């Protein structure tokens, strides 16, 4: 009778360890997926900056208008990267 209680306790402990390990792995995978936002933002921002530089080379007199849209667009793009970073930090440090 006691051996069954010991086996039951061992199974419960092993099950708790696997759940904890699964939670950590899931949190790290989720954090990595959230940080792919930064890669996408970098590509998009580089593309937009290149087009702004091309527009300024063609029409230098439009500097104030292009610069305004360039800065606002960069700020909007960076906000999504910052949100991805915050989500990654929450998953890594809070979801334990």
Curated annotation (Swiss-Prot):
InterPro entries the UniProt entry points to: ATP_synth_F0_csu (IPR000454), ATP_synth_F0_csu_DDCD_BS (IPR020537), ATPase_proteolipid_c-like_dom (IPR002379), F/V-ATP_Csub_sf (IPR035921)
Kindly list the residue ranges recorded as spanning the membrane.
24-44, 75-95
What membrane topology is annotated for this entry? Answer: Multi-pass membrane protein
What the entry lists under CDD domains is as follows:
ATP-synt_Fo_c_NaATPase
The terms under GO molecular function for this entry are: lipid binding; proton-transporting ATP synthase activity, rotational mechanism
Q: Write out the annotated subcellular location.
A: Cell membrane
- For this UniProt entry, what is the primary localization, expressed as one broad class? membrane
Keyword set for this entry?
ATP synthesis, Cell membrane, CF(0), Hydrogen ion transport, Ion transport, Lipid-binding, Membrane, Transmembrane, Transmembrane helix, Transport
What does the protein in this record do? F(1)F(0) ATP synthase produces ATP from ADP in the presence of a proton or sodium gradient. F-type ATPases consist of two structural domains, F(1) containing the extramembraneous catalytic core and F(0) containing the membrane proton channel, linked together by a central stalk and a peripheral stalk. During catalysis, ATP synthesis in the catalytic domain of F(1) is coupled via a rotary mechanism of the central stalk subunits to proton translocation. Key component of the F(0) channel; it plays a direct role in translocation across the membrane. A homomeric c-ring of between 10-14 subunits forms the central stalk rotor element with the F(1) delta and epsilon subunits.
Q: What is this protein called?
A: ATP synthase subunit c
Naturally occurring in which organism (per UniProt): Mycoplasmoides gallisepticum (strain R(low / passage 15 / clone 2))
Organism placement in taxonomy: Bacteria, Bacillati, Mycoplasmatota, Mycoplasmoidales, Mycoplasmoidaceae
**Gene name of the record:** atpE
């Amino acid at each position: 009778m006691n051996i069954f209680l010991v086996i039951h306790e061992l199974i419960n402990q092993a099950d708790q360890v696997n759940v904890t390990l699964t939670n950590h792995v899931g949190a790290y995978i989720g954090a990595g997926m959230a940080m792919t936002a930064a890669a996408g933002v970098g590509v998009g921002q580089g593309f937009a900056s290149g087009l702004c530089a091309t527009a300024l080379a063609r029409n230098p007199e439009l500097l104030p208008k292009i610069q305004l849209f360039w800065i606002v667009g960069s700020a909007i793009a960076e906000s999504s990267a910052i949100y991805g970073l915050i989500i990654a930090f929450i998953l890594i440090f809070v979801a334990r």
